[in-house]
Amino acid sequence: MPVITLPDGSQRSFDHPVTVYDVAADIGPGLAKAALGGKIEGRLVDSSYPLEKDTKLTIITERDMDGLEIIRHSCAHLLAQAVKALYPEAQVTIGPVIEDGFYYDFAYPKGFTPEDLEAIEAKMRELVEQDLSVHRELKSREEAVSLFRRMGEEYKAEIIASIPSEEEISLYRQGDFVDLCRGPHVPSTARLKAFKLTKVAGAYWRGDANNEMLQRIYGTAWPDKKALKAYLHRLEEAEKRDHRRIGADLDLFSIQEEAGGGLVFWHPMGARIRRVIEDFWQERHTAAGYEMLYTPHIAHEELWQTSGHTDFYRESMYQPMEDDHQLYQLKPMNCPFHVLIYQGRLRSYRELPIRWAELGTVYRHEMSGALHGLMRVRGFTQDDAHIFCREEQIENEILGILDLTLEMLAAFGFDRYEIDLSTRPEKSVGPEAIWEQATQALRSALDKKGLDYAVDEGGGAFYGPKIDIKIEDAIGRKWQCSTVQLDFNLPERFAMEYVAEDGARHRPIMIHRAVLGSLERFFGVLIEHYEGKFPPWLAPVQVVVMSITDRQEGYARQVEEAMRNKGFRSLLDLRNEKIGFKIREHILRRIPYLLVIGDREVANQTVAVRTRYSQDLGAMSLDAFMEHLSVDVARLGHNISEED
């Protein structure tokens, strides 16, 4: 009979088969009431899951991240049940958990309105009050297909046909609603009390623009109403900070329908910021011992066959183009190009480590439904770098990468982050000894830097372990930007070599790394982090000079010219408008400093200084203000605020 081992090492013995719920009840009534499910050998299961043999068990409650996933998964089914109750002609398709919530796609040609969402949410709450038990059922493939076809759910029948034959078919039933799902789910609808439907959007079936357009209803769910309220507040903040709206308001960038989705046009103000970022990036990389590269945008398809991209990355690549009976491929990554430069001649151990960096434009095939402003695009510039080194040099190179990465992120105002170390997966390439040495080098570098990190056992790529850094923005969202990835695969595929001290030839270790990731995506994160109020060193216009009347035009021109000659990004506003109107307009443009020139300033050869927060800093000499601005611009990572 089963002996159940709990996370603290304690054990519970039973003389008959039990469920996860039974174990929780044996521990105590409080845990039984809180239990949402269990975790066995890394797999989430329902609270009704039978335990017939000795096993290790973790009881999952709403306090666990896994519990939150169960809640959200169950809310997706609750949403589908409510839609079917109100709109029986709608067909259900898929409803997964996503970050901070869930969605469900419906085939419903009429489309859902905001009023429909209110009615659906009200129905969901009604179903919660009914306290419907949730049960798992196993069906044969034929039974499941027959059931859903009788219900008129053709999409579900299609999904079942795509499930591997060795997988069991499980359904979940609550009340008169049944859905196809692996689970797990909460034991009762009464456990779902803190949720909100947020929006409706279009989505193609299976993400393919050639398929039917579906209606996607998004929602969020949390353990309690307090957490839900906090999230909805963050959501309001996120909407205010939406980079697409701010980008249009400040004329930073656009995506033109005539050119196609996911292709970014940088406007003059956005291009200024990009140039500042690129110059800073190149300066810091040069100081860290990197050499800059430029590589082509296309290459023979054979190159991508050698690198393995056509085998492992084909779905993210565009179709090849033909010229003179030769197929060419747009590059999805820069790595093979850097390898070709390395292969240009035989390398000596004395040359290693080699550090090469490139702001290289790459192209990824993305479904139109997945595109999102600057955050998900088809053509973007990667801040790529590759290091070729010996095994014993790995740790020092990782230390250097971490120094450079954290310094650069701090300069952009990001000093809070999460770090993950991902280790060898079950399927991998390369000798076990090198994997162990490389993983230990990554771990040791993180430890020497005193950085907190989580270990994702088995989460590395098949070709090497990696470090991922997620930055946290002003409203607490996490963004994956920086990556350090060891690669034992490409050196083998390209037969890369260097001549060692003893004259023998060896494979170099290859390290891929990105600090910012995609420039486009990082710019989108910056816009939302600062709400368009960029720090002075990044602002496209750092100071605007405004005259009150045309009597001050000559002096205003002198002031603006002096600013420009000092290297500041300045703007001159001599329009025949009221000064209050000008000030309000430039505050809306988020310009850090506003200089007002009136008769008094002309007479005293001063400037009246204001900030974009309407703070009046008083009159200053031009030299004093330029010194003030110089100090501000030099303070990387600092931004002026309402308190300054």
Curated annotation (Swiss-Prot):
InterPro entries assigned: aa-tRNA-synt_IIb, aa-tRNA-synth_II, aa-tRNA-synth_II/BPL/LPL, Anticodon-bd, Anticodon-bd_dom_sf, Beta-grasp_dom_sf, TGS, TGS-like
Pfam families membership: HGTP_anticodon (PF03129), TGS (PF02824), tRNA-synt_2b (PF00587), tRNA_SAD (PF07973)
EC number(s) per entry: 6.1.1.3
Enzyme kind, highest EC tier: ligase
Cell compartments where the protein resides: Cytoplasm
SMART domains: tRNA_SAD (SM00863)
Cofactor(s) demanded: Zn(2+)
Catalytic reaction(s) noted: tRNA(Thr) + L-threonine + ATP = L-threonyl-tRNA(Thr) + AMP + diphosphate + H(+)
Domain of life: Bacteria
Ranges where the TGS domain occurs: 1-61
Binding site for Zn(2+): 335, 386, 512
GO cellular component: cytoplasm
PROSITE patterns in UniProt: AA_TRNA_LIGASE_II, TGS
Gene Ontology MF terms in the entry: ATP binding; metal ion binding; threonine-tRNA ligase activity; tRNA binding
Record's cofactor remark: Binds 1 zinc ion per subunit.
Keywords: Aminoacyl-tRNA synthetase, ATP-binding, Cytoplasm, Ligase, Metal-binding, Nucleotide-binding, Protein biosynthesis, RNA-binding, tRNA-binding, Zinc
Principal location: cytoplasm
GO biological process, one term: threonyl-tRNA aminoacylation
Stretch list, region Catalytic: 242-535
UniProt-listed Gene3D superfamilies: 3.10.20.30, 3.30.54.20, Anticodon-binding domain, Bira Bifunctional Protein, Domain 2, Threonyl-trna Synthetase, Chain A, domain 2
Complex formation: Homodimer.
Similarity annotation: Belongs to the class-II aminoacyl-tRNA synthetase family.
Function: Catalyzes the attachment of threonine to tRNA(Thr) in a two-step reaction: L-threonine is first activated by ATP to form Thr-AMP and then transferred to the acceptor end of tRNA(Thr). Also edits incorrectly charged L-seryl-tRNA(Thr).
Protein name: Threonine--tRNA ligase
Organism of origin: Nitrosococcus oceani (strain ATCC 19707 / BCRC 17464 / JCM 30415 / NCIMB 11848 / C-107)
Gene it is expressed from: thrS
